[in-house]
Design a protein with these regions (language model features):
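Bacterial N-terminal signal peptides
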Residues: 7-15
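Domain-level recognition of nuclease-like catalytic cores that cleave nucleotide substrates
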Residues: 399-427
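Cationic, glycine-rich low-complexity segments
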Residues: 37-162
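Acidic-basic catalytic patches of nuclease active cores, encompassing PD-(D/E)XK
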Residues: 262-349
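Membrane-engaging insertion elements
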Residues: 146-169, 234-276
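Extended amphipathic alpha-helical segments with heptad-repeat/coiled-coil character used for oligomerization
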Residues: 157-206, 210-223
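Conserved catalytic cores of phosphodiester-cleaving nucleases, focusing on short active-site segments
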Residues: 328-388, 394-396
Length: 427
């Protein structure tokens, strides 16, 4: 992502209404008579790896607007049309298309069909409506039972009609816990997010999980690779082994408690902790990933400021992903050649100060251009670096690619630039 995305994510309006993405270097250069670059419309076939652009079950539409600060993709698939805000979301959605395909293949097997019959005749059939919620379309925000199970696991104790006994309520809780654990196991074994907001995927996961939990269906991840060229390219995720383990073993309520403890341990106040934990822009997965990333910044002061901004300004899944991926880039720098000392804030934007004094901006930014707001923000960074009378080194690190013009402008102002720190689906 780039600075305009940050304006949306962290509310840095005015300072960061900025930049976007430019065509690949092969595109015609900006008009030399213009002081700044225009926001372009990219071509998917030119910027994406071939296996991401097209596969047996999907094609990314050619037009890729950059108006919101992220590459805006539309995916036509055998299972419907999916939107993807940004490079990272594109990778996730394409991978989910192939997970849906594999799950549908499983649902056609005789073993699966027999398991459904067994489930229908078994003691858990009455609980089916408690743990499944039919879905007909992709939504950016989980709804109904899916949202309940995904974000408010602590409310599980309240399930049940008012005239039912406590023992009956506890029995229903046990049923839901067993089902959701099975569903998490299936999703994670396939390398996909069990709390994905892709409702088509959730419906397929529901079916397989129900047959497995209530009907005795034997599910093996070994039989469900995300196949083909696309699968080979997409099986690498940002999730660490510790995140995968936590998602597999812990229900949302436990993750919430762990995240609360971790946030308090790194200096986040009680108010900001609860505000962050209650922000539904963050799924259990993105919430936990963000906290783990911040926790990995051992010894870095003022991490609480990033949490404050994320909790206050994030309003959707793309915002949460931005925070997760940006904090992951911070972790890469901290464990690599730029150990960090503290996080400073320019309004709501976190800026890293390294132990050697280097001022570092590290962002998930798809493809960045030189715009008026980028110029304004550059000036803000230069002022920060000049504080104390001694100019500090300046470094900008982004996940995607910078335009040649942007690199030139930054370098001429004394910045060191580093792009493609996590190029994702880009060629």
């Amino acid at each position: 992502m780039h600075l305009k995305v940050l304006a949306l994510v962290l509310g840095v309006t005015g300072v960061l209404a900025c930049s976007a993405q430019t065509p690949e270097p092969s595109e015609p250069p900006a008009d030399p008579s213009s002081d700044f670059e225009e926001l372009p419309e990219l071509k998917a076939s030119e910027i994406l790896k071939p296996e991401v652009f097209q596969g047996p079950h999907h094609t990314v539409r050619e037009s890729v607007p950059t108006s919101s600060g992220m590459n805006q993709f539309v995916i036509d698939s055998d299972f419907g049309v999916f939107d993807a805000d940004g490079n990272e979301m594109l990778l996730r959605r394409v991978k989910e298309v192939y997970a849906i395909a594999q799950l549908k293949d499983v649902s056609r097997t005789d073993q699966f069909k027999q398991s459904l019959l067994t489930a229908a005749q078994g003691p858990y059939n009455a609980a089916k409506n408690l743990v499944k919620d039919p879905v007909t379309a992709v939504s950016n925000v989980p709804k109904g039972v899916m949202k309940f199970m995904g974000r408010a696991g602590q409310s599980i104790k309240n399930i049940g009609k008012k005239d039912e006994s406590q023992s009956e309520d506890e029995n229903k809780v046990e049923k839901i816990i067993g089902y959701t654990k099975t569903k998490r196991k299936i999703a994670i074994s396939m390398g996909i997010d069990p709390y994905s907001t892709n409702a088509v995927l959730q419906k397929q996961l529901d079916e397989i999980a129900w047959a497995s939990w209530a009907g005795g269906f034997t599910f093996s991840a070994a039989t469900l690779p995300i196949g083909g060229a696309a699968g080979a390219a997409l099986t690498v995720t940002q999730a660490s082994d510790s995140l995968d383990k936590m998602l597999h073993e812990k229900p949302p309520a436990d993750l919430r408690a762990i995240n609360r403890s971790s946030l308090r341990s790194i200096g986040v106040g009680a108010t900001d902790t609860e505000r962050f934990l209650n922000n539904t822009a963050f799924s259990p997965t993105s919430q936990t990933a963000f906290v783990l990333n911040l926790k990995s910044l051992e010894g870095v002061a003022n991490r609480a400021a990033f949490v404050h901004a994320a909790a206050k300004e994030s309003s959707n899944e793309s915002d949460a992903l931005f925070c997760v991926q940006t904090s992951a880039l911070m972790g890469q720098l901290h464990s690599g050649d730029h150990p960090l000392a503290r996080i400073a804030m320019i309004e709501n934007l976190p800026v890293c100060i390294a132990k050697d004094g280097t001022v570092i901006v590290t962002l998930q930014w798809d493809y960045a251009a030189w715009t008026p707001a980028a110029a304004d923000f550059t000036g803000q960074l230069q002022k920060l670096a000049a504080q104390g009378g001694e100019g500090k080194p300046l470094l900008i690190v982004i996940s995607g690619q910078m335009s040649p013009r942007l690199q030139q402008e930054l370098q001429s102002r004394g910045f060191t630039v580093r792009d493609r720190a996590n190029s994702g689906p880009l060629r």
